[in-house]
């Protein structure tokens, strides 16, 4: 009787053990996934993926590309959180998308902060709109430029900005905001400086090659003036950290020096005429520039060269116009040109034949 009772007990034990083994045996994943293929998720899930797709398809050439991308990603993450919480009850999906949503919102806030309208002081607005805005300098970068190591100073009429052979050129760089200044050399009037023009751009360019120099001209306020002044040393360090702004300054200073050379040719040039200057120089300006270069390069004394240039420019209107070669300094050796015969010209092998352009 005991043997008959033990047989069903053994059978039940084996059956229980096999059922446990079956429960531990892994089920092929294809069976469960294929069964889930027929399930269609809620509409919120699909709208979230549409938001992701639209955000990734925004062209990078669009001005607000990054802002629109972050908006669409944030909207998609929000819909994912709603879908995982209300329709799927998936805690892990909700947590991950909440993290992604927070990251996108932080980045979106930073982008909107950078795009905020930057307020430029009214007194500096003219300088920005005339000099820096046409060169696509952002307002925030201009504000950084004018907000550090920079101050606005005032000069009354008759006060001196710089004195020749006394004032150092290594201290500052300035832009005239209001008024008018007069530049002279040894009592000779050279030109005027008008608003939105650099006051000491030639000196700034010269100090990049030679340090410790003095002003060679005297600059006096011809009216009540206000000007924007940078510390030369700190401005140089700042421009080294901003390559784009460094190139902008190189261009603006070079253009300002060119305008001052135009003013040397016509001292009566006013601010309105300066705005209308043509890119190409007139014949009179070319002659004046040639005289100045020849005078400076041919004279051992800078003062004699300037006097020669001033006398030549003042008498240009009264004297008959001659060729640039005739007005060259006597110390400069003229270019020797071969005399051509009617038929042909023979030139020695060591000689250089120069043809004069019409």
UniProtKB/Swiss-Prot annotation:
Gene Ontology biological process: cell migration involved in heart development; epithelial cell-cell adhesion; heart development; hematopoietic progenitor cell differentiation; positive regulation of locomotion; positive regulation of receptor recycling; regulation of cell shape; regulation of endocytic recycling
Effect of residue 202 to A: No effect on cAMP-binding
Subcellular location: Lateral cell membrane; Cell junction, Tight junction; Membrane; Cell membrane, Sarcolemma
Protein name per the record: Popeye domain-containing protein 1
Residues in compartment: Extracellular: 1-48, 92
Phenotype of the disrupted gene, per the record: Skeletal muscle regeneration appears to be less efficient and delayed. Knockout mice are deficient to adapt heart rate to physiological stress, this deficiency develops in older mice. They show severe sinus node dysfunction with long pauses and intercurrent periods of normal synus rhythm. The sinus node structure is abnormal with a loss of pacemaker tissue from the inferior part of the sinus node and a compact structure of the superior sinus node. They have inpaired functional recovery after ischemia/reperfusion injury.
Primary localization: membrane
Gene Ontology cellular component terms for the protein in this record: bicellular tight junction; caveola; cell projection membrane; lateral plasma membrane; membrane; plasma membrane; sarcolemma
Region (Required for interaction with KCNK2): 136-186
Organism: Mus musculus (Mouse)
